[in-house]
Amino acid sequence: MIKKASLLTACSVTAFSAWAQDTSPDTLVVTANRFEQPRSTVLAPTTVVTRQDIDRWQSTSVNDVLRRLPGVDITQNGGSGQLSSIFIRGTNASHVLVLIDGVRLNLAGVSGSADLSQFPIALVQRVEYIRGPRSAVYGSDAIGGVVNIITTRDEPGTEISAGWGSNSYQNYDVSTQQQLGDKTRVTLLGDYAHTHGYDVVAYGNTGTQAQTDNDGFLSKTLYGALEHNFTDAWSGFVRGYGYDNRTNYDAYYSPGSPLLDTRKLYSQSWDAGLRYNGELIKSQLITSYSHSKDYNYDPHFGRYDSSATLDEMKQYTVQWANNVIVGHGSIGAGVDWQKQTTTPGTGYVENGYDQRNTGIYLTGLQQVGDFTFEGAARSDDNSQFGRHGTWQTSAGWEFIEGYRFIASYGTSYKAPNLGQLYGFYGNPNLDPEKSKQWEGAFEGLTAGVNWRISGYRNDVSDLIDYDDHTLKYYNEGKARIKGVEATANFDTGPLTHTVSYDYVDARNAITDTPLLRRAKQQVKYQLDWQLYDFDWGITYQYLGTRYDKDYSSYPYQTVKMGGVSLWDLAVAYPVTSHLTVRGKIANLFDKDYETVYGYQTAGREYTLSGSYTF
């Protein structure tokens, strides 16, 4: 619903309901400009997913949550735990900034992209998702968009849950949040998930030498947080989490050589912070440490054998963010410091290296009559490539009450990672990848339908690629991406509808060929209703045609992959006020399709789960 909001409570910006699972226009978000503001005041397209949405969808992975959102295209080398990539609005998987509680996710390896198949869904309490450039706020990576996974629970209580499903899937979870006195609360969580999986390789596509076995996944997770309010304005927190994952994947036989077909990932993160929440001024200081160890090995020889590979990364972060209400809006400023360190002898970096980055930024939001203005600028000083600046600006005009036009422009960049710089095939002279983006949008509320339609263009230069002849990474590539995004949500009686359409033309700007693994069109539809205390949900997704490479041939051949329509059906029933049982059929019509050429998807899957809260 569109309505006016007062300045001090809602930044004095006209409230428009963007496409989101939480359709309240006054939902507060922190990701867009690094300070708390109503979602309706953010000019960039923004989606919020709550834990209630995740439970209603009965999602068993983060990828299953994200695939439902506008502009997102997920590819995966098979089922649970297998290597996955997130493409937002046609940009590379490495052009998506993933934050955990506002802190950059630690990424080991040479790809520089987040593999969220490994991140436990049990930790996800909320997702804030911003589309478009955000490097002027966050620095490197935020070319296609920002995904902020928030682990903090909103309400006290205890929940015990269990689930079972196809391919011997099982999941057990216990979480609790308790008050210790009036000013302190503690949160604890433990989770175990396992599936035997299935054989992910489609033999007709990848030849006859593939390994024939089930490719399973095992994940064990622990989480703890302590929060304390010193006064009404001052508060602090300490939190930590870790997960221990094992993934079996398909490898190819080479006589006399170990068969590396098992991945073992250890990850731990620790954060501590101090917050000041005044009437006009807000400030937050956060320090963070994370450490990940990613092994690939033959289980007959073990992960410490000379044939095994190891990607190990330590990341240290300090963030100081401030926000002041000024006039009919606010101004934010802050400093980020980050250090990433590799361990000598990892799979990609023979010697130990570190990379430091210090960024300073300024953000602003202001309303003048029927106009809303938003801007940000940032300067990063990197130990490898020196100083790099980015900026963005947006303007919104409510030309008729309830209808708004938005125009925006922004620059962004992706820094080369340590593997690309110093790995066996690294190039220390690499420059950052750079992006220039334009977007225009109309949004409004018409006959009960909350809608938005956007058109955008993104020109990316200095793309980093690998040269088969020099065996080095280099800057040369260019991409040109054009797209249209339309979203809407509305109710018809007891039925709630959420729909989105994406058209993405992502091309190599030099050869004019389509970029791989991006669907040209996507349609996503969610229908929810309640009947006789049963909560029903139907999910539909159309994935359009896309292109990929057949790596089993030489030279590699480009292949065209057809589109597919997918349906999910979910139902939940509250047996009592404490006990809820749920059931789901994914891929209802058992469609046979691939998102990565040569790797088959699971087909129809069933899950049954229950949760008890007290």
UniProtKB/Swiss-Prot annotation:
TBDR plug domain: residues covered:
38-152
Alphabetized CDD domains for the sequence: ligand_gated_channel
GO MF annotation terms: ABC-type vitamin B12 transporter activity; metal ion binding; porin activity
Give the range the annotation lists for the signal sequence: 1-20
Task: Please report, in chain numbering, the residue ranges of the motif TonB C-terminal box.
Answer: 597-614
UniProt keyword annotations, A-Z: Calcium, Cell outer membrane, Ion transport, Membrane, Metal-binding, Porin, Signal, TonB box, Transmembrane, Transmembrane beta strand, Transport
Record motif TonB box, residues: 26-33
Tell me the protein family, please: Belongs to the TonB-dependent receptor family. BtuB (TC 1.B.14.3.1) subfamily.
Residue numbers binding Ca(2+) 1 = D199, Q211, D213, D215, D250
PANTHER family xrefs:
COLICIN I RECEPTOR-RELATED, TONB-DEPENDENT OUTER MEMBRANE RECEPTOR
* NCBIfam families in the record: PRK10641.1, TonB-B12
Q: Where in the cell is it found?
A: Cell outer membrane
The gene designation is btuB
Which residues belong to any copy of the TBDR beta-barrel domain? 155-614
Query: What domain of life?
Result: Bacteria
Protein known as: Vitamin B12 transporter BtuB
PROSITE patterns for the chain: TONB_DEPENDENT_REC_1, TONB_DEPENDENT_REC_2, TONB_DEPENDENT_REC_3
